[in-house]
From Swiss-Prot:
Lineage of the species this protein comes from: Eukaryota, Metazoa, Chordata, Craniata, Vertebrata
Listed name of the protein: BBSome complex assembly protein BBS10
Major subcellular location class: other
Function, as annotated: Probable molecular chaperone that assists the folding of proteins upon ATP hydrolysis. Plays a role in the assembly of BBSome, a complex involved in ciliogenesis regulating transports vesicles to the cilia. Involved in adipogenic differentiation.
Subunit and partners: Component of a complex composed at least of MKKS, BBS10, BBS12, TCP1, CCT2, CCT3, CCT4, CCT5 and CCT8.
Species of origin: Pongo abelii (Sumatran orangutan)
GO cellular component: cilium
Length: 723
């Protein structure tokens, strides 16, 4: 029996689905978020604040819901962060689209917005809107990120040129990350554990390759132990394999190891050949030859000081016996991932047993510091002291917990943190090129790599250097009226004159380092000057492909970084703007990228900043599609800090926080953050683009077909009918 239901694809249908998902994840957002209890069909109970785990645990029937969760999962596999924010932002975007296209007149919208809404409603096709979203992502977002948001970026590095990592900044980043994914009683401990692991595994020359290694092999680098408190979790030097020795022989001194991917014992015949036995005597002779050959190979390994044999396959009993006789420990049946991890750490190729016996030296061996069994709560493991040939220093994480489910949550959170750091420590190329025409090197045009179009950049600052925030009331009534108009028209927030005139920036904890070996009290500000200068610029306007082919001709230009200091009682400050240095040229082109290590204080700063600059762009844009997309995205961005501040009251509430931010931006004053945590700018950017891509997929759906099938009958394979 087959039944089907056909429904027209629409924003309203997608919004209804997204709102259900939003109701689930919004209650566990931020440090004040609660844990959600889920009961799976198997009877398993899941108690978690991890948005990705909650969404994957849901039993979803609606096709759009499954598609949204698939988009979230794809995003998490790359970035490890943002599942709950993904759903909230997507839901607010759908609300904005639905409100614009469904309402003829909205009293909260200005006349310009209503005109653009009618224009879009007349388009009558969602695919037109989806194309405008793609245009926004590739041609508008990157320019605003680099030209305006970059003025507020902080660096997690204590030295931006040498990329020296500041431990205190990393702790702030990790604490903010784990507070939304791990229980309140454990998130600081897990954050400290992660920070310790990071610095124990890294060398001074460590690069992005170490993050890639830990991300790719995180399952092999951690061990879960149930029945113990979380506080018993620790870091162990060396590699812990979740296997036991097939034979263990204690060894001292130099220990050499070999890796084999096939049986050491010779076979009767090789692949593709035939071995014929005509009598029992021939069989016995062949068996004796194999035994002698195996014994000779193991003796030869022993003579080369090989005391450990790592095997990805099951070895015959004869190999195990002669290994024990010759004092060689054997670990077998390792997974391909475990063997690959060992090979990447020590740079060792597999040992291939020779067809003809030889006394020559075995080249494929590696030194090991130690090789011993490790017992964790009555279970035996293999503990190896590998000598690394790469920038990664082998360490394993032992995660303890009373239940397996809690351990899995901590594993997911730690793995996601490494994914986040992997993206944070990479430069992110932006999809446009800026043109400078004046003597001061001021950027005037956005020239995009994927398009021949150029856009005039809106001017929103006077280029002055940051200054401390002062506890003063607003004296300029014109400025006050301008701020109120901005709030009413663009943000649907109505605040009285008294509230706006008398608000006082509140005190916040200062950002001070807590490590013992580093005393960095400032965070480096990465400004607009970190762009790359392209000498060979003329063909860029003629052929888009030249922008990539001339990448090797670009010259890195270093500039002195501004410093963000902490003023006692004033909170942590973000720079408002900075001046471009004189490049000494009348015309040049800059290919922009977001440098590694860019962060912002948590608490909705990224969303409020991008909201503000998008609205400024929309006011000066003459294309109705671009204006409407910018307005919708700008207003949807505020949905995230609204959820974060929903439990706050008074001067800590979202309206007051938003007023302070807008007033600071309009008066060219530094922003003051009420929280000390940090979050990755790269992660925020990737989240925004992932949501826009998901929304584009939703808007291109014309028809939703739900197919329901009756459960198929399961036949017993041993039934008489089948026999």
């Amino acid at each position: 029996m087959l039944s089907s239901m056909v429904a027209a694809g629409s924003v309203k249908a997608a919004l209804q689905v997204a709102e259900v998902l939003e109701a689930i994840v919004s209650c566990c957002v931020g440090p004040e978020g609660r844990q959600v209890l889920c009961t799976k069909p198997t009877g398993e109970v899941l108690l978690s604040r991890n948005g990705g785990r909650l969404l994957e645990a849901l039993h979803l029937e609606h096709p759009i819901a499954r598609m949204i969760v698939d988009c979230v999962s794809s995003h998490l596999k790359k970035t490890g962060d943002g599942a709950k924010t993904f759903i909230i932002f997507l839901c607010h975007l759908l609300r904005g689209l639905h409100a614009i296209t469904d309402s003829e007149k909205d009293p909260l919208m200005c006349e310009n917005i209503q005109t653009h809404g009618r224009h879009w409603k007349n388009c009558s096709q969602w695919k037109c809107i989806s194309q405008a979203l793609l245009t926004f992502q590739t041609q508008i977002l990157d320019g605003i990120m680099d030209q305006y948001l970059s003025r507020h970026f902080l660096s997690i590095f204590s030295s931006a040129k040498e990329k020296t990592l500041c431990r205190s900044s990393l702790e702030l980043l990790l604490e903010a990350y784990f507070c939304g994914r791990v229980g309140r009683n454990n998130h600081k401990f897990i954050s400290q554990l992660m920070c310790d692991y990071f610095f124990k595994c890294m060398t001074c020359e460590s690069g992005i390759g170490v993050f890639e290694l830990v991300d790719d092999y995180f399952v092999e680098l951690n061990v879960g132990v149930t029945g113990l408190p979380v506080s018993d979790s620790r870091i162990i030097a060396g590699l812990v394999l979740q296997k036991d020795f097939s034979v263990y022989c204690p060894a001292d001194g130099d220990i050499r190891m070999v890796i084999v991917t096939e049986t050491v014992q010779p076979l009767f015949s090789t692949s593709g050949s035939e071995f014929i036995l005509n009598s029992e005597a021939q069989f016995q002779t062949s068996q004796f030859w194999i035994m002698e050959k195996t014994q000779a190979i193991m003796k030869h390994l022993h003579s080369q000081n090989v005391k450990l044999l790592i095997s990805s396959v099951k070895q015959p009993d004869l190999v195990i016996y002669y290994a024990g006789v010759n004092g060689i420990s054997v670990v077998e049946c390792l997974s391909s991932e475990e063997v690959s991890l060992i090979r990447r750490i020590i740079g060792l190729s597999p040992f291939v047993p020779p067809q003809a016996f030889s006394q020559c030296e075995i080249p494929n061996t590696a030194l090991v510091k130690f090789c011993k069994p490790l017992i964790l709560r009555s279970k035996r493991y293999v503990h190896l002291g590998l000598i690394s040939t790469c920038a990664f220093i082998p360490h394993s994480i032992v995660l303890c917990g009373p239940l397996q489910g809690l351990i899995e949550q901590h594993e997911d959170a730690l793995h996601g943190a490494f994914k986040m750091l992997r993206q944070l420590f990479k430069d992110l190329d932006l999809s446009y090129i800026t043109q400078t025409n004046d003597q001061n090197g001021t950027s005037s045009l956005f020239i995009y790599k994927n398009s021949g179009e150029s856009y005039q950049a809106p001017d929103t600052g006077n280029g002055s250097i940051q200054r401390p925030y002062q506890d003063t009331v607003v004296e300029n009534k014109d400025e006050l009226e301008k701020t109120q108009t901005y709030l009413k028209v663009h943000s649907n927030l109505v605040i009285s004159d008294v509230e706006l005139e008398t608000y006082i920036p509140y005190s916040t904890p200062t950002l001070t380092p807590t490590d013992t070996f580093q005393t960095v009290e400032t965070l480096t500000c990465l400004s607009l000057e970190r762009n790359r200068l392209t000498d060979y610029y003329e063909p860029l306007l003629k052929n888009n492909s030249t922008a990539y082919s001339t990448r090797g001709n670009r010259i890195e230009i270093s500039y002195e970084n501004l410093q963000v200091t902490n003023i006692t009682g004033k909170g942590s400050m973000l720079p408002v703007s900075c001046k471009l240095q004189n490049m000494g040229t009348s015309q040049s082109y800059l290919s922009s990228s977001m440098p590694a290590g860019c962060v912002l204080p948590v608490g909705g700063n990224f969303e409020i900043l991008l909201h503000y600059y998008l609205l400024n762009y929309a006011k000066k844009c003459h294309q109705p599609e671009e204006t409407m997309v910018s307005m919708i995205i700008a207003n949807a961005l505020l949905g995230i800090p609204k959820v974060l501040y929903k439990s706050k009251t008074g001067k800590y509430s979202f309206p007051h926080t938003y007023i302070r931010a807008v007033h600071a931006l309009q008066t060219n004053q530094p922003l003051v953050s009420s929280q000390t945590g940090l979050e990755s700018v790269t992660g925020k950017y990737q989240l925004l683009t992932s949501v826009l891509q998901c929304l584009t997929k939703i808007l291109t759906i014309d028809v939703v077909i739900t197919v329901k099938r009756d459960p198929q009958k399961v036949h017993n394979q041993d039934s008489e009918d089948e026999l």
